[in-house]
Amino acid sequence: MAPSSPRPALPALLVLLGALFPGPGNAQTSVSPPKVILPRGGSVLVTCSTSCDQPTLLGIETPLPKKELLLLGNNQKVYELSNVQEDSQPMCYSNCPDGQSTAKTFLTVYWTPERVELAPLPSWQPVGKDLTLRCQVEGGAPRANLIVVLLRGEEELKREPAVGEPAEVTTTVPVEKDHHGANFLCRTELDLRPQGLKLFENTSAPYQLQTFVLPATPPQLVSPRVLEVDTQGTVVCSLDGLFPVSEAQVHLALGDQRLNPTVTYGNDSFSAKASVSVTAEDEGTQWLTCAVILGTQSQETLQTVTIYSFPAPNVILTKPEVSEGTEVTVKCEAHPRAKVTLNGVPAQPPGPRTQFLLKATPEDNGRSFSCSATLEVAGQLIHKNQTRELRVLYGPRLDERDCPGNWTWPENSQQTPMCQAWGNPLPELKCLKDGTFPLPVGESVTVTRDLEGTYLCRARSTQGEVTREVTVNVLSPRYEFVIIAVVAAAVIMGTAGLSTYLYNRQRKIRKYRLQQAQKGTPMKPNTQATPP
């Protein structure tokens, strides 16, 4: 408040004496206006009057800065009171010869609060948990006309007079999903309408509420229980019943390795999918973590993943290619903790290696030796296989099945001479008549007299050679007629001979029966006698 200008001590003394020892006269002092409401720091004009009709001492007593503006005769003065900072009661006084008197005017100062502040809201508020709102108000007058209102948007939550300095108003409200994103604020109302002024409002800075729901159930984590070194696996983490689901943060990690999931959101659920790669440095048991953070809460699921190294078993042949009759050692070796089996080997105690010995035969050419290894990892059986093929070198072969020794074909017919030589490596085959004329093996030819004859088939390879004679017979049309005639004659003669035999047999039977009848020998019914 600005200091007032120096005032003479005499008026104050006169006022005091007039108040203590009022005179017997009827002179009165009045003031206008008797009541004033004005903004803080404002000015007001006050008129002091007296009814004394004689020269008198007229003035105003106030701590406020004052300025005499107008003298209306000896019994009325107008003063300007300025920089009114608080409620005040200036007093007009007059000292008439027949007595002293005083009159007061009541100055009421109004001003809106200097601070209206809503306490900050929690960054996140769980749905279902009550929220406490607190508003502080500093300053503001007149307090009898000052109200504090707490609001959610435009909805009033509480209305209360401002009491105390600073005034504080609190309320507790339940929190629901629908309140997510709602603005909360505090407002003051200085209602001076009854005094002919208006309603003055001050509003705090708003705070937006963020609500959330994170279920008590941990997220579901799906991943391989075991994972082989230098391979990839897929991890999926999911959870239902979240709100707002788009604000959920998902963290996936394998040991110290942070994963980068692709997150798919539903209405109130999410699914996070990530690929995980492991190396030899990760071998052993690792913790796979899925953590979901929403608001101020989190849920976490832990699961162990066993990282293992299990190379395929090694199948070892003494030599992958041997000659017929050579002894070959077949070995199978695997991880020290694995158990191996090798096809063709008699049952042996389980272990990481096995072997057997064989003598190579042509039938072993192209034979596959398969080794199966089994390793138990975290209760799961892991299987690996490896196969090696044996090549056996053996000499050429020509046999009756694949290279018949005799062919008989009609002249002018279409025929395909077939002669297959076997061996490893596959032998070269040539069939020649008289050392020069080749037999077109595997080709369709028209049979002529030139094709007839004996051919020497020779199969040759790095493992040796073998020969075989084959004969081609060509039947001309005249030979076909002779053969048909001979066959027909044989059929006719056979038929005639059979008829003669049957006729003689029946004749002998009748002759025998006649002789028996002449001797009186009874004949047994339904029994034929054996002919002599």
UniProtKB/Swiss-Prot annotation:
Question: Motif location (Cell attachment site)?
Answer: 152-154
Q: How does it sit in the membrane?
A: Single-pass type I membrane protein
Q: Where is the signal peptide?
A: 1-27
- Record GO terms (molecular function): integrin binding
GO CC, sorted alphabetically, is:
external side of plasma membrane; extracellular exosome; immunological synapse; membrane raft; plasma membrane
Q: Main site of residence?
A: membrane
The keyword Signal belongs to this UniProt entry's keyword annotation? yes
Please state every residue range assigned to the domain named Ig-like C2-type: 41-103, 128-193, 230-297, 325-378, 412-464
Keyword set for this entry?
Cell adhesion, Disulfide bond, Glycoprotein, Immunoglobulin domain, Membrane, Phosphoprotein, Repeat, Signal, Transmembrane, Transmembrane helix, Ubl conjugation
Output the GO biological process annotations, alphabetical, semicolon-separated.
cell adhesion; cell adhesion mediated by integrin; cellular response to amyloid-beta; cellular response to glucose stimulus; cellular response to leukemia inhibitory factor; establishment of endothelial barrier; leukocyte cell-cell adhesion; membrane to membrane docking
> What does the UniProt entry say about where the protein is found?
Membrane
Per its UniProt record, what SUPFAM superfamilies does this chain match?
Answer: Immunoglobulin
**Residues with glycosylation annotation:** N202, N267, N385, N406
Q: Where are the transmembrane segments?
A: 481-503
The UniProt PTM text for this protein says:
Monoubiquitinated, which is promoted by MARCH9 and leads to endocytosis.
Per the entry, what this protein does is: ICAM proteins are ligands for the leukocyte adhesion protein LFA-1 (integrin alpha-L/beta-2). During leukocyte trans-endothelial migration, ICAM1 engagement promotes the assembly of endothelial apical cups through ARHGEF26/SGEF and RHOG activation.
- What is said about its interaction partners and assembly? Homodimer. Interacts with MUC1 and promotes cell aggregation in epithelial cells. Interacts with ARHGEF26/SGEF. Interacts (on T cell side) with CD81, CD247 and CD9 at immunological synapses between antigen-presenting cells and T cells.
Tell me its family: Belongs to the immunoglobulin superfamily. ICAM family.
Q: What is the official name of this protein in its record?
A: Intercellular adhesion molecule 1
Q: Which gene encodes it?
A: ICAM1
